[in-house]
């Protein structure tokens, strides 16, 4: 089985979903954009703005939708004893809240409900300074106090987005997921 995830896109990607289907790919769409009357033909279409969704989470950014998907998947795998059966350690999803907070703020979604909670908890994770790439970015931005919502939206986010404008769209992913001291990534 070939599986593709789309994040923050796919809601209106009818021809792309048809192409994926022709290529034998299953696609899971994780999005938050407003859909039209019909949905893309995907293996799964997860969007809190679907007309049949009653979660009242339509204010989530795609990063929040993705996180909620991972929480649900993690819960399901745990209930089926999948981690133990495969001799794998269950991931601690809390450690990703730094990135969830960054994405939530940078997508300019309302800071209410679970968004607010994810940002508050994400800022706590950031203060622990365990993400090498994010630490390097914080140092470059000369943020010498506790990282704030303002810092995420106006100092860190724009630096990550700038790489995409000069043809290095994977730079942000490389930076935020590096296990090195980020020196090689930042060059």
Kindly give the residue locations of the regions a language model identified.
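Single conserved hydrophobic/aromatic residue that forms the stacking wall/gate
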Residues: 177-187
């Amino acid at each position: 089985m070939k599986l593709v995830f789309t994040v923050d896109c796919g809601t209106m990607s009818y021809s792309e979903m048809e192409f994926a289907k022709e290529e034998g790919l299953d696609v899971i769409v994780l999005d938050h954009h407003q859909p039209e009357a019909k949905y893309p033909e995907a293996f799964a279409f997860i969007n809190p703005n679907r007309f049949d969704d009653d979660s009242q989470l339509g204010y989530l950014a795609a990063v929040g939708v993705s996180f909620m998907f991972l929480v649900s998947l993690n819960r399901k795998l745990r209930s089926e004893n999948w981690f133990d059966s495969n001799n794998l350690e269950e991931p601690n999803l809390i450690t990703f809240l730094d990135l969830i907070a960054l994405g939530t703020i940078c997508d300019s979604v309302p800071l209410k409900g679970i968004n607010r909670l994810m940002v508050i908890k994400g800022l706590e994770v950031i203060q622990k300074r365990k993400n090498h790439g994010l630490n390097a970015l914080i140092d470059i931005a000369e943020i010498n106090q506790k990282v704030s919502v303002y810092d995420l939206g106006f100092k860190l986010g724009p630096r990550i987005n700038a790489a995409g404008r000069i043809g290095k769209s994977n730079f942000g992913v490389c930076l935020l997921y590096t296990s090195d001291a980020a020196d090689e990534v930042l060059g």
